[in-house]
């Protein structure tokens, strides 16, 4: 995980404008974004990402966690503390927390 650059503009067809218009992303949109992000970050196929597997099991170190939460926060236009991954340790949990 040396290169933590993820092309967030290419993650999905979702964009900030549509999120802001409806007061935040849906649970499904959050899951789709996180799956796409991890797929790119970890060089895995989307099918290899499980919404119920903990971020720790994917081997995210602190640097990757900071990148993920920063990029996710940019996507939803909110500042996200990287320690949120301890409270919501799976894609499913994050989606339930942040999804509308």
UniProtKB/Swiss-Prot annotation:
It comes from the Bacteria. GO terms for molecular function: phosphopantetheine binding. The keyword Cell inner membrane does not apply. Keywords: Fatty acid metabolism, Lipid metabolism, Phosphopantetheine, Phosphoprotein. Residues 1-25 are annotated as: Disordered. Its cofactor is pantetheine 4'-phosphate. InterPro entries: ACP-like_sf (IPR036736), PKS_PP-bd (IPR020806), PP-bd_ACP (IPR009081). Residues 25-100 form the Carrier domain. Pfam families: PP-binding. This is Acyl carrier protein JamC. The lineage of its organism: Bacteria, Bacillati, Cyanobacteriota, Cyanophyceae, Oscillatoriophycideae.
């Amino acid at each position: 995980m040396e290169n933590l650059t993820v092309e967030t503009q290419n993650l999905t067809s979702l964009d900030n404008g549509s999120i802001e218009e409806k007061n935040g992303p849906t649970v499904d949109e959050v899951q789709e974004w996180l799956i796409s992000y991890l797929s790119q970050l970890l060089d895995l196929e989307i099918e290899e990402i499980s919404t119920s597997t903990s971020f720790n099991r994917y081997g995210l170190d602190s640097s990757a966690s900071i990148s993920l939460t920063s990029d996710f926060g940019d996507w939803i236009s909110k500042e996200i503390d990287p320690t949120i991954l301890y409270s919501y340790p799976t894609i499913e949990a994050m989606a339930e927390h942040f999804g509308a």
